[in-house]
A protein has these predicted regions:
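A short, solvent-exposed beta-strand micro-motif common in secreted/extracellular proteins
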Residues: 81-93
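C-terminal motif of bacterial Sec signal peptides marking the signal peptidase cleavage site
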Residues: 13-16
Length: 339
């Protein structure tokens, strides 16, 4: 399945300058008046992790000098407030970053995206239209009994008289575990846990489960839909992903096709809340023939340095949004159609 490409713009930074009259020589800036309230900030490059100097902060009642060579700066406010205020961090060569920060407050790290990074592809992958992601490593539940496919929207499934071999199960778990760090910016090194279930023949299993990623083989998925895999994810309105389900066609998964690992990684991406990429090569291309690459690793690294709800260009949600759980819904889902 595909989705509509967002109409996107580009961002650039600009530097201002001033000049003195011809009768006066160079002037040395005097010491700035310290703000009554302040917060320490360290600015880093979201991809390399290196510090960024020359970053300026702006916002309502906000003051402060540009970040040092060590990437440090102090952001001051004209008053103290228990609520966070929007502060924009700007530097040429980087996308302007807007965060919600408390002044005064504890030291924060602000990561900035280089302007050379493909924001259009990033938006396709992760922000549709706002960032969706898990906030803690999900557990994985493997159903070893093959289930009967009836619909991409089915909430439960009947089990048939067929069980995944131990070798197939271990291979599936290994591929998903291999893909997880690469699809989470190395934030999640492993699933929170892996459990295996084998329900009785003709028993029924709930396939939409909160707090876990459920994966199973389905008989008849490709025949009915043309897809080798299909996945859905559950998310709150603030962008936090809290559940996922992965359907893999039984016949495809038992085959020795070269795309099997890339398909598994692709479907895991959907269960993590990601959508199809059309602009450049990615594990989340609808063809699902590409394993996680540099773009995927960098994009998810950036994403996991931002809270759910972050929007283009690079603006974090207000504190009120971060603290609101909101309702949870299941996505319509996306699939990998056979070629």
């Amino acid at each position: 399945m595909t989705r509509q490409l967002l109409c996107l713009g580009l961002v650039c930074g600009a530097l201002g300058c001033s000049s003195s009259s011809s009768n006066s020589g160079p002037t040395t800036p005097g010491p700035s008046t310290p703000a009554a309230f302040s917060t320490s900030v360290r600015v880093t490059d979201a991809i390399t992790g290196s510090t960024v100097s020359g970053v300026t902060a702006s916002g309502d009642g906000v003051s402060g000098r540009a970040s040092s060579l060590a990437g440090t700066m102090t952001v001051g406010g004209d008053s103290s407030s228990a609520s966070a205020r929007a502060v924009a961090f700007t530097r040429a060569g980087y996308v302007t970053r807007t965060v919600a920060m408390k002044i005064p407050g504890n030291e924060i790290v602000v990561s900035m995206i280089p302007s050379t990074f493909n924001l259009d592809a990033y938006d396709e992958l992760l922000r549709a239209p706002r960032l969706q992601r898990w906030t803690s490593a999900p557990p994985l539940r493997v159903q070893t009994r093959t289930l009967q496919f009836t619909s991409i929207n089915q909430s439960d499934a009947a089990a048939i008289d067929e069980v995944m071999s131990d070798a197939d199960r271990l291979g599936l778990e290994a591929d998903l575990s291999w893909a997880l760090p690469q699809l989470t910016g190395n934030t999640f090194q492993a699933f929170a846990g892996i459990t295996r279930d084998t329900i009785d023949v003709n028993g029924r299993m709930q396939v939409l489960n909160t707090g876990v990623i459920t994966v199973a083989r389905y008989a008849g998925l490709t025949t009915a839909t043309g897809y080798w895999g299909y996945s859905r994810w559950q998310f709150r309105t603030d962008g936090t992903v809290i559940g996922g389900t992965i359907m893999i066609d039984r016949d495809f998964d038992r085959s020795s096709r070269s795309e099997r690992r890339s398909l598994r990684a692709h479907e895991l991406g959907h269960a993590l809340g990601y959508t199809h990429v059309t602009i450049l090569t990615s594990v989340m291309n609808a063809s699902a023939v590409t394993e996680p690459n540099t773009f995927d690793r960098q994009a998810t690294q950036i994403a996991f340095l931002r809270p759910p709800g972050n929007v283009r260009l690079d603006s974090d949600p207000a504190e009120a949004s971060l603290n609101r759980l909101g309702a949870a819904v299941w996505s319509r889902g996306e699939g990998f159609r056979r070629r």
